[in-house]
Regions:
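Interfacial/gating helices of multi-pass transporter permease domains
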Residues: 1-12, 79-86, 113, 147
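Small-residue-rich hydrophobic transmembrane alpha-helices
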Residues: 4-61, 65-67, 98-112, 116-117
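Transmembrane alpha-helical core residues of multi-pass small-molecule transporters
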Residues: 8-11, 55, 123-125, 152-156
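Short alpha-helical transmembrane segments in multi-pass integral membrane proteins
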Residues: 29-94, 135-187
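Short, glycine/charged-rich beta-strand-loop motifs at protein surfaces that mediate ligand recognition
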Residues: 91-95, 105-106, 119-122
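Membrane-embedded alpha-helical transmembrane segments of multi-pass integral membrane proteins
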Residues: 98-101, 127, 156-159
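Transmembrane alpha-helical segments of integral membrane proteins
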Residues: 102, 128-137
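Cytoplasmic juxtamembrane regions at transmembrane-helix boundaries
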Residues: 114-125, 129
Length: 187
């Protein structure tokens, strides 16, 4: 268990800056939403998405490449180190999608869509992870336990991507509608 705890701590080191960035940037999206400034919203959303995804991909790649030196900062026991290194690698396989999940959750909250935000937010450590962590260890033992985190992360990322593309489509339609309305009023 100490090895998995090390892997989770390393995972949180990457997750917390992304979460903090999204919480801070949420106010910009909320302001744009309230002002119906869809150009500002799209510009801010694309920037948020770029920053969160770039950071999460870079962080996960760095952890996968440097898993052993990172783990050795927490433990000098070889057995713990071996398990922690493999745990780090598995936990970070799909961590690049965490940036998307965090961005989508913040965006939905800024738009006042709390229920949909909860669906995205609870996927990763809730309704996708709990069944996986109960089922996969029975089927594949400890490897199944480790895989359950990666599988839940992948599933949550796919849900977040689907919702994100849908929300961007709605924003673009609102922008076109607002533009056509402005032309209709002016003409």
């Amino acid at each position: 268990m100490a090895a998995v705890g090390i892997a989770v701590r390393i995972l949180m080191v990457g997750a917390l800056p992304i979460t903090g960035f999204c919480i801070g940037a949420q106010a910009i999206l909320g302001f744009g939403w309230g002002a119906r400034d869809y150009v500002r919203i799209l510009k801010a959303a694309k920037f948020m998405l770029f920053v969160t995804v770039a950071f999460s991909i870079a962080y996960s790649a760095a952890v996968v490449v440097f898993a052993r030196p990172l783990v050795s900062l927490f433990s000098d026991n070889e057995n713990v180190t071996e398990i922690a290194v493999s745990s780090c690698i598995v936990f970070h396989l799909f961590f690049g999608l965490f940036g998307v999940q965090s961005f989508v959750t913040a965006m939905l909250q800024a738009f006042g869509r709390a229920r949909l935000s909860a669906i995205v937010a609870l996927a990763r450590q809730g309704y996708l992870f709990i069944p996986a962590v109960l089922l996969f260890p029975v089927v594949a033992g400890f490897d199944g336990l480790l895989a359950s985190q990666a599988i839940a992360e992948l599933g949550a990322g796919m849900i977040a991507l689907f919702v994100m593309f849908h929300q961007f489509g709605e924003l673009r339609r609102a922008l076109r509608h607002r533009g056509s309305r402005a032309i209709g009023i002016a003409g």
